[in-house]
């Protein structure tokens, strides 16, 4: 058997994809279209009333348009800021681990390194 050659066997079942050796079936002739039904007569103009215009609802206060949970004074800042009773060191009351001195400056670790 050569490379890319057929090993024989039955017909491909992929004829529907690649166009089998069958001749296409002729399309059935559509039945002649029946004459369209006559359109109903339009209703008299007096029976059709123009819809009454509804007054537009009053504009709501702009401060009421802010979604719940967003303070109006900070509406231009999308980042969450924790402010409330559960902020700070309320759990452990430990001092912060934040660096309070500039690099090379004063250090609170003098007891380790023999500070002045």
UniProtKB/Swiss-Prot annotation:
Report the superkingdom from the record: Eukaryota
Biased composition (Polar residues) is annotated at 72-90
List the InterPro entries.
SPR1/2/3/4/5
- Please list the residue ranges that the record marks as compositionally biased, kind Gly residues: 1-12, 103-116
Q: Name one GO cellular component term.
A: cortical microtubule, transverse to long axis
Q: Where is this region: Disordered?
A: 1-116
**Pro residues compositional bias, start-end:** 27-43
> Which residues pair up as cystines?
none
Q: Could you say which protein family the record assigns here?
A: Belongs to the SPIRAL1 family.
Query: What is the annotated role of this protein in its UniProt record?
Result: Acts in maintaining the cortical microtubules organization essential for anisotropic cell growth.
Name it: Protein SPIRAL1-like 1
User: What organism does the record attribute this protein to?
Assistant: Oryza sativa subsp. japonica (Rice)
């Amino acid at each position: 058997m050569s490379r890319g050659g057929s090993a024989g066997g039955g017909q491909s079942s992929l004829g529907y994809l690649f166009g089998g050796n069958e001749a296409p079936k002729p399309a059935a002739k559509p039945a002649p279209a029946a004459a369209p039904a006559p359109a109903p007569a339009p209703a008299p103009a007096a029976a059709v009333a123009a819809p009454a215009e509804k007054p537009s609802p009053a504009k709501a206060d702009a401060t009421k348009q802010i979604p719940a949970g967003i303070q109006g004074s900070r509406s231009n800042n999308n980042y969450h800021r924790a402010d409330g009773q559960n902020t700070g060191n309320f759990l452990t009351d430990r001092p912060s681990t934040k660096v309070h001195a500039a690099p090379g400056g004063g250090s609170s670790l003098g007891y380790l390194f023999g500070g002045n």
